[in-house]
Swiss-Prot record:
Transmembrane segments: 21-41, 53-71
Summary of the function given for this chain in its UniProt record: Mediates the uptake of pyruvate into mitochondria.
Homology family: Belongs to the mitochondrial pyruvate carrier (MPC) (TC 2.A.105) family.
Disease the record associates with this protein: Mitochondrial pyruvate carrier deficiency: An autosomal recessive metabolic disorder characterized by severely delayed psychomotor development, mild dysmorphic features, hepatomegaly, marked metabolic acidosis, hyperlactacidemia with normal lactate/pyruvate, and encephalopathy. Some patients have epilepsy and peripheral neuropathy.
Superkingdom of origin: Eukaryota
Protein name in UniProt: Mitochondrial pyruvate carrier 1
Bilayer topology: Multi-pass membrane protein
Species this chain originates from: Homo sapiens (Human)
Database matches in PANTHER family: UPF0041 BRAIN PROTEIN 44-RELATED
Length: 109
């Protein structure tokens, strides 16, 4: 069973359809876009003082918009959808960190 699945996957990777997909914007666009969520995830280790509320809000709106686009475009671009879903979650976490930081700052003042 597993051998047949591996063989089928290997055949697909060798196919012209897969090569065409690798050479399309449906692949390279999302690959380039992965820099945003990777940077947001990396910034979670840094102090919340560096978080820009306006930029976090803008990136949340951007990711929501392009999640919808990735779902509506035909054929559906699941790689782009996953990229923006990851970025949306990362930005919401960053926004939560900023709100918590601001609340503790005003409570201690």
């Amino acid at each position: 069973m597993a051998g047949a699945l591996v063989r089928k996957a290997a055949d697909y990777v060798r196919s012209k359809d897969f090569r065409d997909y690798l050479m399309s914007t449906h692949f390279w666009g999302p690959v380039a876009n992965w820099g945003l969520p990777i940077a947001a995830i990396n910034d979670m280790k840094k102090s919340p003082e560096i978080i820009s509320g306006r930029m976090t809000f803008a990136l949340c709106c951007y990711s929501l918009t392009f999640m919808r686009f990735a779902y509506k475009v035909q054929p559906r671009n699941w790689l782009l959808f996953a990229c923006h879903a990851t970025n949306e979650v990362a930005q919401l976490i960053q926004g939560g960190r900023l709100i918590k930081h601001e609340m503790t700052k005003t409570a201690s003042a």
